[in-house]
Amino acid sequence: MGITSAMVKELRTKTGAGMMDCKEALTSSNGDFEKAIDYLRKKGMSAATKRSSKAAKEGTIASYIHMGGRIGVMVELNCETDFVAKTEDFKNTAKDIAMHVAASNPTYVNPDEIPEEALEREKEIYRSQALAEKKPEKIWDKIIEGKLNKYYEEVCLTKQKFIKNTDITIETLINNLIAKTGENVIIRRFARYQLGEELKK
């Protein structure tokens, strides 16, 4: 497919990579944005990749209270400098993420935090399902990969669709902020509380 300047601009906005790098990535991936982003990451061309080695020790802790005080969230969002931490873009992003956590109830920040035993348990379930559905064994790995990606979207904050703009994920939201600020930005941790959730009826 033809690669348009609008596509290149959109990829550049999402990743912070150079225009020529974005065009190369889109050409290589035949216009597939997710594959183009992966291409840039593998090449170390995205702003997120370049900034990831920088220490992010400044930042803010944002809070959000929802549903008449029945759900509360705190999110720690980190960056490299106090200057960026005080910007409205940074503070608003932290607040938006806290609001998202309240609504979407993720379990982990990203897939790296999922315990290995939990992943193996999920994979075993998917294998059993594939066997029960009499799927050819040669496509099991592909089926498991697809189901794992769906699982990540359910339990991992960074893989979820952003509630205020479902065209992007939380990961893309962070990458956009990295591109805009020129600093490494990471979601360090979050906590979500729901009134009475630990009480037995």
Curated annotation (Swiss-Prot):
InterPro entries: EF-Ts_dimer_sf, Transl_elong_EFTs/EF1B, Transl_elong_EFTs/EF1B_dimer, Transl_elong_Ts_CS, UBA-like_sf. The keyword Cytoplasm applies. Keywords: Cytoplasm, Elongation factor, Protein biosynthesis. It is found in: Cytoplasm. GO terms for molecular function: translation elongation factor activity. Gene3D superfamilies: 1.10.286.20, DNA helicase RuvA subunit, C-terminal domain, Elongation factor Ts, dimerisation domain. The keyword Protein biosynthesis applies. Residues 81-84 are annotated as: Involved in Mg(2+) ion dislocation from EF-Tu. NCBIfam families: tsf. Associates with the EF-Tu.GDP complex and induces the exchange of GDP to GTP. It remains bound to the aminoacyl-tRNA.EF-Tu.GTP complex up to the GTP hydrolysis stage on the ribosome. HAMAP family: EF_Ts (MF_00050). This is Elongation factor Ts. It comes from Syntrophus aciditrophicus (strain SB).
